[in-house]
């Protein structure tokens, strides 16, 4: 098996997973703290998707910590297949949620100027949360590509 940056059970893999956890948690926190987000399906999907990403990344980060402390190898083909499929699923969900939320945010801020008509709406927070979710997707894409290349 190849040893690459971001491999499971390495310090770089742990840093990648912790980055995914941090951006997912920040995206959820910013979105949930904004006013009236729950009335829009795309924003609820973003919170659900980032919640799944947070759980998945935290679980794999804990597994990385365990492997680093025990100096064990997590690169068996069965584990790598599981990690690859899980990373691809969570990365695609994160991308879909980020894109749909970005579409709604652009519609509110640029196209209809709904944010100017409704000053109580937290459009700046929507934009920050969407930006964090795109950064989360970028980290998830790196992780999923790394897993795929280690697997083949």
UniProtKB/Swiss-Prot annotation:
Subcellular location: Cell membrane
Topology feature Extracellular, residues: 33-42, 99-131
Transmembrane segments: 12-32, 43-63, 78-98, 132-152
Keywords, sorted A to Z: Cell membrane, Glycoprotein, Membrane, Transmembrane, Transmembrane helix
Keyword check for Transferase: no
Membrane topology: Multi-pass membrane protein
Chain ranges on the Cytoplasmic side, renumbered to this chain: 1-11, 64-77
Pfam families reported for this sequence: CASP_dom
Signal peptide: none
UniProt GO cellular component terms: plasma membrane
Tissues where the protein occurs: Expressed in leaves, exclusively in hair cells (e.g. differentiated trichomes and immature cells).
Statement: the UniProt record of this protein carries the keyword GTP-binding: no
Glycosylation sites: 39
Binding partners and assembly: Homodimer and heterodimers.
Family, similarity comment: Belongs to the Casparian strip membrane proteins (CASP) family.
Annotated protein name in UniProt: CASP-like protein 5B1
């Amino acid at each position: 098996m190849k040893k690459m940056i971001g491999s499971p059970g390495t310090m770089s893999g742990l840093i990648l997973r912790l980055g995914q956890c941090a951006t997912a948690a920040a995206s959820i926190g910013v979105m949930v703290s904004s006013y009236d987000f729950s009335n829009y399906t795309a924003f609820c999907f973003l919170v659900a998707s980032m919640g799944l990403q947070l759980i998945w990344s935290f679980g794999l980060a804990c597994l990385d910590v365990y492997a680093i402390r025990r100096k064990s190898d997590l690169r068996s083909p069965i584990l790598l297949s599981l990690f690859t499929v899980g990373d691809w699923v969570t990365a695609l969900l994160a991308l879909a949620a980020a894109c749909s939320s970005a579409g709604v945010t652009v519609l509110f801020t640029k196209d209809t100027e709904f944010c100017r008509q409704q000053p109580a709406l937290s459009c700046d927070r929507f934009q920050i949360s969407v930006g964090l979710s795109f950064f989360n997707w970028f980290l998830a894409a790196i992780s999923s590509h790394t897993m795929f290349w280690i697997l083949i």
